[in-house]
Design a protein with these regions (language model features):
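Terminal low-complexity/charged segments
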Residues: 1-166
Length: 166
């Protein structure tokens, strides 16, 4: 069954222009169903986001999402979902990191990133260097661990009781 709304289309020459603008900080590209993902060197994520926003018109940071791949040396992936309102086009910028290495914060470009980075920190334990308020946002302040990591036990580390009667 086809849908009556237009499908997202590739922007003509966009990937090549991005490759030229990002240079050595661009590690890989992948396009699928009209959406392109760019894998970026961790230390270059702020500049890559600035280029996407200022040179290519991706004005809106829609989401920052984490993913955990325990089999990789840099097990965490941080995904930045950007939208160009003028072109009606989305892209994804991805960086990889390990537990010890912080990802540079993009709060200088989009202040709303502070909330999104806090969520990734809380659920995966990924630190963001330069985030002015990196504390838990979804779990209790005394919560132990990061619940969306693949090695987090399904029952948690501590039994919590919210009712004195139980």
């Amino acid at each position: 069954m086809s849908h009556h709304l237009p499908r997202m289309k590739e922007r003509e020459g966009f990937v090549d222009a991005c490759k030229a603008a990002l240079g050595a900080s661009l590690l890989a590209t992948k396009s699928h169903v009209g959406e392109t993902s760019f894998t970026i060197a961790r230390d270059a994520i702020v500049e890559a986001c600035r280029i996407a926003r200022d040179q290519f018109g991706y004005q809106q940071l829609m989401e920052i999402a984490g993913a955990d791949y325990p089999e990789r040396p840099e097990r965490f992936e941080v995904n930045y979902h950007l939208l160009s309102l003028t072109e009606n086009h989305r892209i994804r910028l991805k960086v990889s990191t390990d537990e010890a290495s912080a990802v540079p914060s993009v709060t200088s470009l989009w202040p709303v990133a502070g909330w999104l980075e806090r969520e990734v920190f809380d659920l995966y334990g990924v630190a963001f260097a330069g985030n002015p308020d990196l504390r838990r946002i979804l779990t209790d302040y005394g919560f132990e661990g990061h619940p969306l990591r693949k090695d987090f036990p399904q029952t948690g580390y501590v039994e919590l009781r919210y009712s004195e009667a139980e």
